[in-house]
UniProtKB/Swiss-Prot annotation:
Binding site for NAD(+): 73-74, 147-148, 175, 177, 246
SUPFAM superfamilies for this protein: NAD kinase/diacylglycerol kinase-like
Cofactor (UniProt): a divalent metal cation
EC number: 2.7.1.23
Location (main, coarse): cytoplasm
GO biological process terms held by the UniProt record: NAD metabolic process; NADP biosynthetic process
Function of the molecule: Involved in the regulation of the intracellular balance of NAD and NADP, and is a key enzyme in the biosynthesis of NADP. Catalyzes specifically the phosphorylation on 2'-hydroxyl of the adenosine moiety of NAD to yield NADP.
Organism of derivation: Chromobacterium violaceum (strain ATCC 12472 / DSM 30191 / JCM 1249 / CCUG 213 / NBRC 12614 / NCIMB 9131 / NCTC 9757 / MK)
The name this protein goes by in its record: NAD kinase
Length: 291
């Protein structure tokens, strides 16, 4: 059977102990099967690359028709934001801790990747968020987020105050440590730790989860992902907005942050037999069936 993907980019976290041999094992295996292998230049040194082309991460979406990440969810997040504009699918090999998105164990890497290349996979489209920071009617920053956009206080110990709007309708004002605006993918990350709901990845929803609100009546809510969410900082020093916990922008009072669903979803390819609830039970150590 002809392989579906011919140009494959490999990405790994170079600082992870033992990652380079696994990366090169996969590269050699793919090349032996006839694929054109590209390697992210942040993942290996030129000497380690063994002659494979090294490319910038910003070029992955233009040059590859599949990207395989060896690492944890943090690496997946950074690559997801780069690939989404190009609709390039993503496969995750688990080298991290929890690995909610990297669902292929290392010892099954070669067999699972071969199956995916021959069309045996479970595709899943997941939304991203597009956020813009507006100051005095001018956009001063923008970014994509695969997990969440987090509005929070900085190093100063006091709470911040802000107002929240959905589709230009006032929802509430809040005094708290901040607010998490989460995708379904991000609902098992910071949002979950803050008391937010777990959202199935295919659910067309966005969760708004307060961080340590002063009023106990401020509870998480979920809205349709077609909505535009806006929050405005009304009082607070050293406040910031974070994108997937990897990028951030410092805020000033009266700054507004506008958040909406990004136009392109990201497609993740899972191995055959993937079951979301099995994954949750395993990763979160939920109780097993009694019979």
């Amino acid at each position: 059977m002809e392989r579906l993907f011919k140009h494959i980019c490999l990405v790994a976290r170079h600082s992870k102990p033992g990652i380079t041999p696994a990366l090169m094992q996969l590269a050699n295996h793919l090349a032996a099967g006839g694929a054109t292998v590209l390697i992210d230049k942040e993942s290996v040194t030129p000497d380690e690359a063994n002659g494979y082309p090294l490319i910038d991460r910003t070029d992955m979406g233009k040059l590859a028709d599949l990207c395989i990440v060896l690492g944890g969810d943090g690496t997946m997040l950074s690559i997801a934001r780069l690939l989404a504009p190009y609709r390039v699918p993503l496969v995750g090999i688990n080298q991290g801790r929890l690995g909610f998105m990297t669902d292929i164990p290392l010892h099954e890497m070669l067999d699972s990747v071969d199956a995916i290349l021959h069309g045996k996979f479970v595709p899943e489209d997941r939304i991203l968020l597009q956020a813009a920071v507006v100051r005095e009617d001018a956009e001063v920053a923008s970014a994509l987020a695969f997990n969440d956009v987090v509005f929070s206080r900085g190093a100063v110990g006091s709470m911040i105050e802000f107002e929240v709007f959905i589709d230009n309708q006032f929802v509430y004002s809040q005094r708290s440590d901040g607010l998490i605006v989460s995708t379904p993918t991000g609902s098992t990350a910071y949002s979950l730790a803050s008391g937010g709901p777990i959202l199935h990845p295919t659910l067309q929803a966005i969760a708004l989860v307060p961080i340590c609100p002063q009023s106990l009546s401020n509870r998480p809510i979920a809205v349709n992902d077609s909505c535009e969410v806006e929050f405005m900082l009304t009082r607070g020093l050293d406040a910031r907005v974070h994108f997937d916990g990897q990028l951030h922008c410092d805020l000033m009072e009266m700054d507004r942050v506008l958040i909406r669903r990004y136009r392109n979803p990201l497609r993740i390819l899972h191995p055959e037999g993937y079951n979301y609830y099995d994954m949750l039970r395993h990763k979160l150590h939920w109780g097993e069936r009694l019979i």
